[in-house]
Every structure is written in C-alpha cells, then in structure tokens.
Amino acid sequence: MEASCILPVLKKKLAFLSGGKDRRSGLILTIPLCTEQTSMEELSTTLDYLLGIPSEKCKARGFTVIVDGRKSQWNIVKTVVLMLQNVIPAEVSLVCVVKPDEFWDKKVTHFCFWKEKDRLGFEVILVSANKLTRYIEPCQLTDEFGGSLLYDHLDWVNKRLVFEKFTKESTSLLDELIVINENEKGSQAEKDRSSESNILPSFDPETVLQTGHELLSELQQRRFNGSEGGGGGGTAWSPMDDELLAQPQVMKLLDSLREQYTKYQEVCRQRSKRSQLEEIQTKVMQVVNWLEGPGTDQLRTQWGIGDSIRASQALQQKHEEIESQHSEWFAVYVELNQQIAALLSAGDEEDLMELKGLQQQLSDVCYRQASQLEFRQNVLQSAYEFHMTAQDLSQQLDGLLGMLCADVAPADGAAIQQTLKHLEEKLKSVESALQTLREKGQALLDQMSNQTSFSYGKEVGVENKENIDHIHSVMEDMQLRKQRCEDMVDVRRLKMLQMVQLFKCEEDASQAVEWLGELLDALLKTHIRLGDDSQETKVLLEKHKKFVDVAQSTYDYGRQLLQATVVLCQSLRCTTRSSGDTLPRLNRVWKQFTVTSDERQHRLEMASAFHTAAEKIVRESPELAELLVDVEAYEEVETLGKGLLDRLTVPVIFPDGSEQFFGSPGDMASSAESIRERMKLVEEKRFLQEEAEQRLEEEEEEEEAALEVEPRES
C-alpha cells in the first residue's frame, strides 16, 4: 500500500507512529480518538499502512499502543481495542487507554477488559495522561501526553511520499537500467547495432539520484540531531528514523542505482558514439553522393566561355549559383571533418580505421570537386578579361576608324601636329590593347590546354575546340582590323605631313614677303649715305649689290615656296591656297624693292661719278698741286653735283603710284651738305686755278714785254 493512494486518510491523523519507543524498545503506535465519529474502515486502513512500515525486527519487539480516549466515548474505545486484535494481535504487547478526567463506569470497563483479556492476547490498561510516564519515558511521548518528543504529522506524510516515490522510481529505474545494460552487452557481442535496442529509461537517472541523495542526507541529519538530543531531554527520535524509513534501504538503492547508472552512462556513451558514427557515415555519403552526382553533372554541363562580355557574365552568374550550392555541402564537409577529428582524438581503436577511411574519402571528393570549381572559376574569369579586352580593343579600333574616315581640315600646322600626335597615341593604345588581348588569349588557351576530363568519364575536347576556335577567331579578327587601321593611318600620316609641308611653305612664303618688306624698309630708311669719296661710294656699291642679291634670293625662295604649295595642293586635291594674297604681296614688294634698289644704284653711281670727277680736280698730292684742270672738268663736277642734289629731292615712285623718300629730311640734308662741301672745294680749286692762270698770263705778258724791251735796248 502506498501513501499516495490513501493520502486523504493519512492526513486525518487517525493513527501515527511518532518514532517514540517503550522501555522494551518497542515502537509506540498512537491512536488519537476525537469527539467526531471515527471511521473504523479508515482507521483499519491507516493501521494496515503504518504496520507495514517497520522492519520485521522492529515488529518482533512488539508495539505499545496508546489509545487516546479523552475526547471519545467508551464504546468507541472498546471497538478500537477489539479491532486491534484483528489487525495486529501478535505485534501488540501493551495497549494503554488514556482515560478522560470524567472516569467511565469502572465496573463496566473493568468487567469488559477482564472478560476479553484471554481472547485479546495483549494487556490493556486504563491510565490517565499524567500516569503514562510509568510505562513510557517522557522523552518518548509527544507533547499531548506531556512528553518532549516532537512530531509533525503533515511533515511525516510528505516525507513518506518522498520516500515512497523515490523507492518506487529508483526500483523501477534500477530494473530498467539492468535490462538496458544487459541488452547492450548482448547486442555488442552480436554486433547488433539496430536502433530498436536503444531503449531509454522511464525516469531521469540524475533526477532520481538527486532525490535519493537529498532524502538520505535528511535522514542522516535527523538521526544525528536525534541522537544528540535523545539523552538530554531535548528533541527525541524523529519519525523519519532509519527504523521507519529504512535508511539502509535508501543507501542500498542508491549504491545499486549508481552502479547501474555508471554502466548506463557508458552504454549511452557507446550509443552516442555509434549514433554519431552512423550519422557521420550518413552525412559523408550524402556529401559524396551529391558531389559525385548532381554536383559533377552541373560542372559537366558548364564548359563554354561565351562569345561576349554579357555571355561571360551570365556564365559567371550561373557558376556562382553552382558554387553556392557546393558551398552548403562544403560547409557540411568542414563540420564533418571537425567531428571526425574529435572522434579520432578520442583514441577509440575500434572505429579508428573506419573514421580515417571516411575522412580520406570525404576529403578526396571535396578537394577534387573544389579544384574543379576553382579551375572553372579561373577559366571564366580569364574569359571575362579576354572578352573585356576584346571589347575595349574593338571600341578603340572603331574610334580610330571613325577618326580616319572623317574629312578633317586643320587650320594650321600646329593643329595637324596635334592630330598626328593623337593618331599616334591612338595607334599605340590599339597596339598595347592588341598585345594585352594576345597575352590574355594565350593565357586562356594555356588554361584550356591544361584542362583535364572529370575522373568519372567525359572528355571535353569538343567543347574546348569550339572555345579555342573562338579565341583564335577573335584575335585574328582584331589583328586584321588593326592592320587595316594601320594602313589608313599611314595614308593619313602622309596626307598630314603633306599638309604640314603646305602650311610650312605658306608660312615660309609669308615670312619671305615679310623679310623682303623688311629689306625694302631697311633700304629706304638706312641705306642713305652716298659716301664722302669715291672709295667709300665704291664700297657702298658693293654692299648694295650684295644687299640686292639677298633680296633676290629671298624673292626667289618665296617664289619656290609658292610653287611648292601649288604642287602640294594638287597632290592633296584641294584648291590652290597660294592664289590668295601671298603671291601678289610678294610681287608687289619685289617691284617696290626693285624700283628702290635701282634708284639707290643710280644715286650711288652718280655719287661715284661725282666723287671721281671731284677727286681729279681736288688732289692732295704735292706733285699734282700745280696741275691745271680743264674747264670741262669743273663743269662736269658742277653738273654731276647739281644733278645729284636734284636727285636727292626726288622721291622713289612705286608702280602703284605711291612715293617714298630715302631716309628722313635730315638725312637728305646731311647728304646734300656733303655734296655741296665737295662742290665748294672744287669751286675753290677752280678759283685758285683761275687766279694762277691770271698770274701766269700776267707773268707771260710781263716776260713778253721784257723781251720786247731788250731788243730795243740792244
């Protein structure tokens, strides 16, 4: 019978074992009768339960039953005493009926007990509460009988529930653990590792053990406290004493439970290891089967490199999706590898070879698949870079071709040089891009030539041949386009150089006009002196001749340049640019220079004739001092001088009717003054000569007169 089944009855406290003992060490059973009608059935149930608690040894020492009739009627007390005969006649050694203060009819009570004495089998005495100490020590009596023994009925009931629950659960758990451990031993011997043998206990062993330890600890603590207070009149024996709750039984259950639980833990460890190993095997095969199955099939179908950037990007996106699916399985591989490494570090020899085999198989498949993914990714990246370079080169070639096809009309040579520089830079960039395309194409071809077939069978020669042909086709097409552009660049370069020459000729022709104009300006403004004597004039004539030669060379150079522009324009098929104002300006300036030069030449020649004539008259040599000059010479000098002076006042008249003087008025006055001084000297010479001639005539006349006188005198 369990306390939980009769819990409401037990809580009524119809009877209880307080833990106290009589002088014979027999247990004291107390039946506290109350004023209310007591149910004999419930009392009998309570007594049956209580008498099942003590051990047989305790029962052999007999019970002392205290029937508290102070609050009850005699007939109820009598019924209870008679009932004891039917419930525990052999175990009862003494029944103490505690009488109330108002004593029952002595004759009746004595007669009844005496009458039933032989039939009852135990002694029944009537005693007042204060006389119980004659039979039982005060420390073994509870406080309602004047004793010092502490008893809490509800606490006792709760502890009984705990004890019985522990006993029930531990016994059941112990049986289950024994069965599980034995079954596990048999399954290991038969190598039977089916999941059906993985039986779990009905109760949590840790919880049951914890409950048992707490219960045992409390029992031991109660016994310790009770033994301390038992001899000093304090707290006496507790109802949770080992004789009532069988502390050794708890200890024995705990020991057995710990032993079987230790074995069960090993069983669980073996189960966990087997389960983990089986789970690892399952996951390994899942990874291997997927990688060698769907994963390999996905890679087998992806061998193209695309024919454009967009196609290559689409293939890369598809490959990323494949990689994403593989990544999930690679993550499982990493987790499995860690689990296998942990199991290997545990050092279980039994599964060591199997684990290593699984690890090796998993690693081989994963690394092989990862290398295929990486190879495919590298090929796609190289293909993308190849197509990117090809597109960039194609755009550069298109731009260069458009630039070459455009009809440009540069404004000057600097613009042409800039255009040529831009063309050269474009061509150089195209050459660099083509070289990069060749390098990337060759790298891609090398990658594809090193490509191997999958270990599960499919050669990839057909797919590779298409890819290789496409790469060669792209590179050859780009090479041809580049060659065509180079040819057109050569033609454009030649045309540009001719245009540079044209602009240069026009520029130099304009420069020749400017130089000729500068020479004319210099001739008019600086070539003014006519010389102070014939020698200086002769030098000026030589310089003038050279100056005219320079001007003639400049004019001829300008004419040649303008003729070259005509030829270049014919070659370039453009209108003759030199038919503008350059040639008229050149001719106009040259005519002006010719007129001016002739005038300068004429003036220098007149000055030379003047100085020569004057120098014949004016001689500084002493031998020629008395040399007489003809009158015609003087007249010639005077005529030349006046003509030269008149010439200085005459401007240079250009073909267009414009006029220009040599130098400034001051320059002309200076030149005229020099001529006049020379003429003055000649005039003085003439005067002196005339005086000399007059004196000579006078002397001759005097001589003639003298000669005429002498004959007369003689």
From Swiss-Prot:
Q: Where does the record place the CRAL-TRIO domain?
A: 1-153
Question: What segment(s) does the record annotate as region Disordered?
Answer: 691-714
Where are this protein's Spectrin repeats? 275-381, 384-497, 503-605
Which N-terminal residues, if any, form the signal peptide? none
Query: Which SMART domains does the UniProt entry name for this protein?
Result: SPEC
Q: Which UniProt keywords apply?
A: Repeat
What InterPro entries does this protein map onto?
A: CRAL-TRIO_dom, Spectrin/alpha-actinin, Spectrin_SESTD1
Single Gene Ontology BP annotation = blood vessel morphogenesis
Molecular-function GO term, any one: phosphatidylinositol-5-phosphate binding
Q: Where is the composition biased (Acidic residues)?
A: 696-707
Its biological purpose is as follows: May act as the primary docking protein directing membrane turnover and assembly of the transient receptor potential channels trpc4 and trpc5. Binds phospholipids.
Q: Which family does it belong to?
A: Belongs to the SOLO family.
Protein name per UniProt? SEC14 domain and spectrin repeat-containing protein 1
Annotated source species? Danio rerio
